[in-house]
């Protein structure tokens, strides 16, 4: 009896037994957004309080905060675009090589797949049937080979532009939080408001991080808050010292 192979059956060599569903450890848009907000928040809290510590005119703090937001967001977006583009091009190149290997050396690729499934506990006869059935569908065979040999799915390659846009927006949102008080106030009141907003946002980011990592929400949120407050205290202290020295 011939075996009809579907993508689910073809993946049997990698997941022969049902098991507990795990978190997506390779990422996703929501995960990237959370960490982008965290970067923007920490960066601009540090910058704004560092500048505010020198007690300049409120306009100087606003300008510094806006510059940090724009520069940081563009930097994050550019870095994400370059990184994602390079990864996508590399994957596409490797997929093209695998496609050519399947075309030129089908028997060799067939034996590789049989050997792989056998090494994972699939009976030799069943492994042979699966590999043979796969060879009848070139695209499915390519998908399985690239997933097994490269660890990627050709159909799940992300968009560099989308990744860059997400990084830009996430960083900008995080960086805007400690800057908001400086559009409506100045002096110590704005400093305190920036610290409070930064602290609340840090707790929210820490809670979101815990959702992705599976850690304790309280512990992760407190850790995120502690990091933000240490960074804020250090930069504010440096700004104050520089302001006193130059004043």
Residue ranges of predicted features:
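Transmembrane alpha-helical segments of integral membrane proteins
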Residues: 177, 196, 200-215
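Internal alpha-helical transmembrane segments
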Residues: 2-83
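Core segments of transmembrane alpha-helices
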Residues: 40-44, 167-177
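Juxtamembrane boundary at the C-terminal end of a transmembrane helix
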Residues: 237-247
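Residue-level signature of catalytic and energy-coupling elements of molecular machines
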Residues: 39, 78, 127-130, 171, ...
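C-terminal ends of transmembrane helices
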Residues: 81-85, 152-153, 206-216
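Cytosol/matrix-facing amphipathic helices and coiled-coil assembly/linker segments
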Residues: 2-31, 84-168
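Alpha-helical transmembrane segments of multi-pass membrane proteins, especially transporters
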Residues: 31-36, 60-68, 72, 159-171, ...
